[in-house]
């Protein structure tokens, strides 16, 4: 009788031990799954090293401050990660879109290629003070806007408006490649259009609103430098966008003068 009770006690202990192992394993697996797939990255410095060049991050563009950078609110897992029903997503304030009237000067300039960019509708206002990743679009350089009293480059406003029109308030994918000297995440960008997914860097080059990045430090192309240079050449030969100017000062030359 004692032997049977002892065996039963041993069986209970073994079962309890196995259950404990299963629960521990499940907890560890759940934690690893959460940290790998569902934990939000709240700034560029918080991106794990294992993510660079290997993983795409999904999220929403909450602000566009220049022609080649923006703020990205990471939404890991998307709908399945609870965003929009368990976890709140930032809502951007809408802008009342009013058709822009052309004054006499604009009428004289009607055929300037920049008009098609200036007149693009921007639906949302930037939303700041959020836990976002500051993103620098890889492989390209857009014309410089006015900084510290210095004049803006031609087509800098057009590049900004086009970028706001394309991605502000929208969801897209980024692949982190590096962190630049300003603490921004240099990344490849893919965003959805009615024609399918597009490479944001490539689209800017096709529109003539950026040129291939000239800097020697932190030059990142996501493996697409040849494609970028080919489409820069096409835009230049067709005098599209910024290439329509008689004399073009590159963003790199502009910055070297400051």
From Swiss-Prot:
The active site is at residues 136, 144, 184. It is a single-pass membrane protein. The keyword Nuclease applies. GO terms for cellular component: membrane; mitochondrion. The chain crosses the membrane at residues 12-34. One of its GO terms (molecular function) is metal ion binding. Disulfide bonds: none annotated. It is found in: Mitochondrion; Membrane. It is an enzyme of class 3 (hydrolase). Ca(2+) binds at residue 141. PROSITE patterns: TNASE_3 (PS50830). Its EC number is 3.1.-.-. Keywords: Calcium, Endonuclease, Hydrolase, Membrane, Metal-binding, Mitochondrion, Nuclease, Transmembrane, Transmembrane helix. Residues 55-245 form the TNase-like domain. Belongs to the LCL3 family. PANTHER family: EBNA2 BINDING PROTEIN P100, SERINE_THREONINE-PROTEIN KINASE 31. This is Probable endonuclease LCL3. The lineage of its organism: Eukaryota, Fungi, Dikarya, Ascomycota, Saccharomycotina.
